Design a protein with these regions (language model features):
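Alpha-helical multi-pass transmembrane bundles of energy-transducing inner-membrane proteins
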Residues: 1, 82-89, 93-188
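Transmembrane helix-loop-helix hairpins at membrane boundaries of multipass inner-membrane proteins
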Residues: 1-85, 157-182
């Protein structure tokens, strides 16, 4: 049942991203299909999702690869429910990273994405999966801390907001570059 649920969920996600692509106005540019809700108003944290010309293809590719990934993983026999639950949680985290328009929400989705990856590597990985999972954890922990410092730096120096659209307008050009490189350090 969990395999069918995962296949249906990722199939619906793929279908919805293709509908977004069909209805996306490329001539308009900017963010479209925006969903906004106040989340933690005392810290100016909002739940903001949307797509633009860069995030929409990434969302479509994520949906397609996750849909294919379910069927590639169909013959998993070890802890099947746990595997597919972690796979769907990973899918949710990746999709949230591409759709979030609030840095706090982005960071939450980023961490949501990393946890299932750690367990998927550690439990269903190859012969050296424990070593790989620990190494993955240490690298991503270091990168996540650097990214959090960059996000908090933006928050405290640019008007106490995590809203990416607002930050694009108020953040000084130099600060944007420093923050970008700081957040890109997670790739190293």
């Amino acid at each position: 049942l969990i395999k069918i649920t995962a296949a249906v969920a990722t199939g619906l996600q793929l279908l919805l991203t293709l509908v977004l692509w069909q209805n996306y106005d490329a001539g308009n540019g900017g963010m479209q299909f925006t969903v906004r809700g106040e989340w933690i108003p005392s810290f100016n944290i909002s739940y903001i999702l949307g797509v633009d010309g860069l995030s929409l293809p990434m969302a479509i590719l994520t949906a397609l690869l996750c849909f294919i990934g379910i069927f590639v993983s169909w013959n998993i026999n070890k802890a099947v429910k746990g595997y597919f639950a972690l796979f769907l949680l990973l899918d949710t985290g990746i999709m949230g990273v591409f759709l979030s328009m609030d840095f706090f929400l982005f960071y939450i989705f980023w961490e949501v994405m990393l946890l299932p990856m750690y367990f998927l590597i550690g439990m269903w990985g190859g012969p050296q999966r424990e070593y790989a999972a620990i190494k993955f954890f240490l690298y991503t922990l270091f990168g996540s801390v650097l990214m959090l410092v960059g996000i908090l730096g933006l928050y405290f120096t640019c008007g106490n907001t995590f809203d990416i659209q607002v930050l694009k307008q108020v953040a000084p050009e130099a600060l944007q570059g420093v923050t970008w490189w700081g957040m890109s350090a997670i790739k190293v």
